[in-house]
C-alpha cells in the first residue's frame, strides 16, 4: 500500500540529502577571499541544484558626471553586446543554451551583473561574466539599437506615475545632487552617448578593487578560488577614486505637479539614516509598523481597511552610504487627497507621541522577523543581498544576526527615532494631481 511505497522511498531520499550535506559539512557558513588584484570573493554554500554568481560593482547613478546622466544603466545594458572575443549573439546564447539566465540591474550606488544556472555550469557562467565585465567593447552599431530600447523603457516608466513619483521625490529631497537623478537618464542625453563614453565610464569604475565576485551554491570554495585566479590573472589592480560627495543640507519642500491622471499620487517623507547608522534598524521596524507589506500596517488599516480611501498605501526606506530616504506613498481620488494626508500625519504623530507597550513591540518584532525569514526562502534574493552587503560593509550578516539587532530595539529607541524622522517640520511632500 501507500505506506510501503513511502517507506521504500525514504532511505534513498535520506541518503541523497545526507550525501549532499556531507559534501558540504566543512563548508557551512560563508567564505571570503581577496585576490592579489584586489577582487573580493564571497561564497555561501547552499544545498540547491541551482547556483548564482556575479559581479557587484561599486558604481551607480550617483557616480556619473553631469554630462553622463544615465550612463551607469546604459553600460549595464551594453555590457551584453560584445567583447573582444564574443558577439552579442554568442553572449546571449552562452547561458541560455544550458537553461541558465543572465541578468543585471543598476542602482544609485551599485551595478550588479549575474547569472543563475545549474551548479554544473558554474565554470561556463564565471568565464562569461568575467569576459563581459572586463573585456566589453561596446560596439557602436549595438549602441544605436540599445538606445532605442532604453528610450522605450523610459517612456513606459513615465506612463506609470505610481513608480515615477518615487524618483521625483528623491529629486526633490536631494535637489541638485546626483542621488536625485533618475537611474534611466533622459532620452536627449542618451542619444549623444558613444562607444568611447561607455568605455570611459567602465575604465573609471570596473576594476577588481572596486567590486566583489559573489557565489551562492553547492560548490567547493577552493574550486571557486582556483578558477578566479585562472580567469582573472590578466586583470590588473587599479586604484579607483570613488570618493562621493555627500548631499548638501536638507530643506523640506512641498511641490504639486499637475498630471493628466485619474488618480492623485502623494509622497510624504524626508531624508533617512545612512547605511552605517545604528538607528537604521529601529527605523526599519518603525517603517514596517507604519506602512510595511503586512495588511495590518497602521496606514493600510486607517486608509484602506477602515475608510476605503485608497487601493495602495505603503511606506519605504532606502539607505545609501552617506544618507537615506524615508517616504510614505498613496494613490487616491483627487478629492480625497487632503483627508488621506491628514490621516497619514495622524499616524506619524501617534508614533512620535505614544510609546509602544512591550506587547505591541513584541508583536511588531515577531512580524518583521517572520517576514525576513519568509523572504530569505529565495536564493536569488539572498545572493544579491549578500553581494550588496559585502560590497558596502565588507562583511556578510546572517539572518540570525539581523534578528538579534531587531530584538535589541526598545520602546524608548523607537520613540526617539520617530521624533527625529517624523517631525512635521522635517517632512517634504510631492503631489501629482
State each model region's role:
Residues 24-27, 240, 248-250, 296:
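Short solvent-exposed loop/turn micro-motifs enriched in small/polar/acidic residues
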Residues 19-50:
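N- or domain-start disorder-to-order transition segments that initiate the globular core
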Residues 18, 34, 90-246, 256-257, ...:
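Charge-rich, well-structured scaffold segments of protease-associated domains
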Residues 252-254:
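Flexible, small-/acidic-enriched active-site or ligand-binding loops
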Residues 38, 45-95, 169, 206, ...:
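Active/ligand-binding-proximal structured segments within catalytic/core domains
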Amino acid at each position: 500500500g501507500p505506506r510501503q511505497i513511502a517507506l521504500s522511498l525514504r532511505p534513498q531520499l535520506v541518503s541523497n540529502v545526507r550525501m549532499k550535506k556531507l559534501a558540504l559539512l566543512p563548508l557551512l557558513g560563508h567564505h571570503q577571499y581577496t585576490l592579489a588584484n584586489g577582487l573580493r570573493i564571497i561564497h555561501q554554500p547552499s544545498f540547491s541544484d541551482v547556483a548564482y554568481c556575479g559581479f557587484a560593482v561599486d558604481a551607480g547613478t550617483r557616480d556619473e558626471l553631469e554630462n553622463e546622466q544615465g550612463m551607469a544603466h546604459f553600460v549595464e545594458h551594453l555590457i551584453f553586446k560584445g567583447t573582444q572575443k564574443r558577439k552579442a549573439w554568442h553572449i546571449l546564447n552562452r547561458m541560455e543554451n544550458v537553461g541558465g539566465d543572465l541578468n543585471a540591474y543598476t542602482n544609485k550606488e551599485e551595478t550588479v551583473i549575474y547569472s543563475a544556472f545549474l551548479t554544473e555550469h558554474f565554470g561556463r557562467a564565471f568565464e562569461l561574466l568575467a569576459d563581459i565585465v572586463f573585456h566589453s567593447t561596446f560596439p557602436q552599431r549595438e549602441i544605436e539599437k540599445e538606445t532605442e530600447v532604453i528610450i522605450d523603457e523610459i517612456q513606459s516608466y513615465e506612463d506609470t506615475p505610481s513608480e515615477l513619483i518615487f524618483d521625483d521625490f528623491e529629486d526633490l529631497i536631494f535637489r541638485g545632487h546626483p542621488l536625485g537623478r533618475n537611474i534611466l537618464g533622459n532620452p536627449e542625453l542618451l542619444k549623444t552617448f558613444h562607444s568611447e563614453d561607455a568605455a570611459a565610464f567602465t575604465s573609471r569604475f570596473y576594476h577588481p578593487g572596486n567590486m566583489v565576485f559573489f557565489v551562492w551554491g553547492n560548490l567547493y570554495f577552493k574550486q571557486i578560488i582556483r578558477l578566479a585566479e585562472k580567469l582573472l590573472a590578466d586583470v590588473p589592480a587599479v586604484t579607483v577614486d570613488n570618493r562621493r560627495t555627500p548631499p548638501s543640507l536638507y530643506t523640506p519642500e512641498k511641490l504639486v505637479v499637475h498630471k493628466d491622471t485619474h488618480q492623485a499620487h502623494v509622497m510624504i517623507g524626508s531624508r533617512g539614516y545612512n547605511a552605517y547608522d545604528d538607528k537604521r534598524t529601529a527605523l526599519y521596524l518603525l517603517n514596517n509598523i507604519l506602512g510595511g507589506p503586512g495588511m495590518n500596517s497602521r496606514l493600510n488599516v486607517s486608509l484602506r481597511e477602515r475608510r476605503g480611501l485608497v487601493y495602495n498605501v505603503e511606506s519605504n526606506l532606502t539607505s545609501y552610504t552617506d544618507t537615506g530616504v524615508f517616504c510614505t506613498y498613496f494613490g487616491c481620488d483627487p478629492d480625497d487627497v487632503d483627508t488621506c494626508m491628514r490621516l497619514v500625519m495622524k499616524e506619524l504623530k501617534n508614533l512620535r507621541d505614544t510609546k509602544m507597550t512591550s506587547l505591541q513591540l513584541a508583536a511588531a518584532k515577531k512580524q518583521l522577523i517572520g517576514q525576513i525569514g519568509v523572504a530569505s526562502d529565495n536564493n536569488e534574493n539572498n545572493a544579491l543581498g549578500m553581494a550588496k552587503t559585502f560590497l558596502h560593509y565588507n562583511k556578510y550578516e546572517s539572518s540570525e544576526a539581523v534578528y538579534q539587532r531587531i530584538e535589541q530595539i526598545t520602546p524608548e529607541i523607537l520613540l526617539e527615532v520617530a521624533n527625529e524622522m517624523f517631525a512635521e517640520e522635517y517632512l517634504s511632500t510631492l503631489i501629482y494631481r
